[in-house]
UniProtKB/Swiss-Prot annotation:
Swiss-Prot/TrEMBL keywords: Electron transport, Heme, Iron, Membrane, Metal-binding, Mitochondrion, Mitochondrion inner membrane, Respiratory chain, Transmembrane, Transmembrane helix, Transport, Ubiquinone
UniProt cross-references to Pfam families, sorted A to Z: Cytochrom_B_C, Cytochrome_B
Further remarks about this protein from its record: Heme 1 (or BL or b562) is low-potential and absorbs at about 562 nm, and heme 2 (or BH or b566) is high-potential and absorbs at about 566 nm.
GO CC list: mitochondrial inner membrane; respiratory chain complex III
Membrane topology (UniProt): Multi-pass membrane protein
InterPro entries the UniProt entry points to: Cyt_b/b6_C (IPR005798), Cyt_b/b6_C_sf (IPR036150), Cyt_b/b6_N (IPR005797), Cytb/b6-like_sf (IPR027387), Cytochrome_b (IPR030689), Cytochrome_b_C_euk/bac (IPR048260), Cytochrome_b_N_euk/bac (IPR048259), Di-haem_cyt_TM (IPR016174)
SS bond partners: none
Cofactor annotation: heme b
Gene name of the record: MT-CYB
Domain of life: Eukaryota
Assembly and interaction partners: The cytochrome bc1 complex contains 11 subunits: 3 respiratory subunits (MT-CYB, CYC1 and UQCRFS1), 2 core proteins (UQCRC1 and UQCRC2) and 6 low-molecular weight proteins (UQCRH/QCR6, UQCRB/QCR7, UQCRQ/QCR8, UQCR10/QCR9, UQCR11/QCR10 and a cleavage product of UQCRFS1). This cytochrome bc1 complex then forms a dimer.
CDD domains: cytochrome_b_C, Cytochrome_b_N
Compartments (UniProt record): Mitochondrion inner membrane
Protein name: Cytochrome b
Length: 381
């Protein structure tokens, strides 16, 4: 008798996705981040669900409801800090996952890659709205500054901002709708993840060599299930170390002050995982220009397949482009640092140089390096 997992309509899908899936025999730990992102999403949905049971999305009680969760709810502090730091782990895994995709040329899987870019935007939107919910100073002013950027859109900008706010400033209506969207978006993300995997399983996984691995496949289970479990254990160790020993290390002290529209914090900045984009936004001394640069800094990922000039897929055997890739990685760290600094000399100049470098490396230098490497390796035909 054939195993039920191969016959049952529902179990068959699970079997073909996680058990009998043919996987390349040589995928490294860089391929662990997909499953880690899945675990992060599950953690965020579960902790978020329990937080929503005690949270109130009203400007007069939102801040105190979060305090109540931390002080009075059984293990409320644990749930709250797992959710807050879980978001940080989510973004660390996201950035590494995208970086892996860029390094090994996974963007040649066009559908999978484009769904991934949409997922990145969706997760960023969710995280932004979640940061507004505790209704601290940085929640309020972050929401005010970022939503205000939409007013740079010609003609419809101001109307659009007031429509999103539900009034003439960030207030009760804004908080309520942000809570509603913050609750629903993770489920939309989960649906998109299924589509992401659906497209991935049409082609099969990429691998570090960038070569076709059809001739050398192994079953996903037990090889990669056990490997993924190791990754999950390490992820949970890092997350719980953050939660139990340094719960506030990635947060902003200003968010422990209740929101006050009459008192602006000295330095308004988003959570650490948005700082690189915030630095690019601030580096352009024009509102609309800054907003466009901000959007393009992420949207540029969608045009990576068009910038592929090399005859090879990944960067494994391409030392020139490899060097540029790691300079780009360092450049992103510089942008992250600058995003958290005040707008004054020399930070303004450093931010502008890092922003120019970011776009130059991706749009000009890497494609040129690809062509040079083709010639050096005599891949001219």
């Amino acid at each position: 008798m054939t195993n039920i997992r191969k016959k049952h309509p529902l179990l068959k899908i699970i079997n073909d996705s996680f058990i009998d899936l043919p996987a390349p025999s040589n995928i490294s730990s860089w391929w662990n981040f997909g499953s880690l992102l899945g675990i992060c999403l599950i953690i965020q949905i579960l902790t978020g669900l329990f937080l929503a049971m005690h949270y109130t999305s009203d400007t007069s009680t939102a801040f105190s409801s979060v305090t109540h969760i931390c002080r009075d709810v059984n293990y409320g502090w644990l749930i709250r800090y797992m959710h807050a730091n879980g978001a940080s782990m989510f973004f660390i895994c996201l950035f590494l996952h995208v970086g892996r995709g860029m390094y090994y040329g996974s963007y040649t899987f066009m559908e999978t890659w484009n769904i991934g870019v949409i997922l990145l935007f969706a997760v960023m939107a969710t995280a932004f709205m979640g940061y507004v919910l505790p209704w601290g100073q940085m929640s309020f002013w972050g929401a005010t500054v970022i939503t205000n950027l939409l007013s740079a859109i010609p003609y419809i900008g101001t109307t659009l901002v007031e429509w999103i706010w539900g009034g003439f400033s960030v207030d009760k209506a804004t908080l309520t709708r942000f809570f509603a969207f913050h609750f629903i978006l993770p489920f939309i993300i989960a649906a998109l993840v299924v589509v992401h995997l659906l497209f991935l399983h049409e082609t099969g996984s990429n691998n570090p060599s960038g070569l076709n691995s059809d001739a050398d496949k192994i079953p996903f289970h037990p090889y990669y299930t056990i490997k993924d479990i190791l990754g999950v254990i390490l992820l949970l160790m890092v997350l719980m170390t953050l939660v139990l020993f340094f719960p506030d290390i990635l947060g902003d002290p200003d968010n422990y002050t209740p929101a006050n529209p009459l008192n602006t914090p000295a330095h308004i900045k988003p959570e650490w995982y948005f700082l690189f984009a915030y630095a690019i936004l601030r580096s352009i001394p024009n509102k609309l220009g800054g907003v466009l640069a901000l959007i393009l800094s992420i949207l540029i990922l969608a045009i990576l397949p068009l910038l592929q000039t090399s005859k090879q897929r990944g960067l494994t055997f391409r030392p020139i482009t490899q060097t540029l890739f790691w300079i780009l990685a360092a450049n992103l760290l510089v942008l992250t640092w600058i995003g958290g600094q005040p707008v004054e000399h020399p930070f303004i100049l450093i931010g502008q140089l890092a922003s120019i470098s970011y776009f130059t490396i991706i749009i000009i230098l890497m494609p040129v390096a690809g062509m040079i490497e083709n010639n050096l390796l005599k891949f001219t035909h």
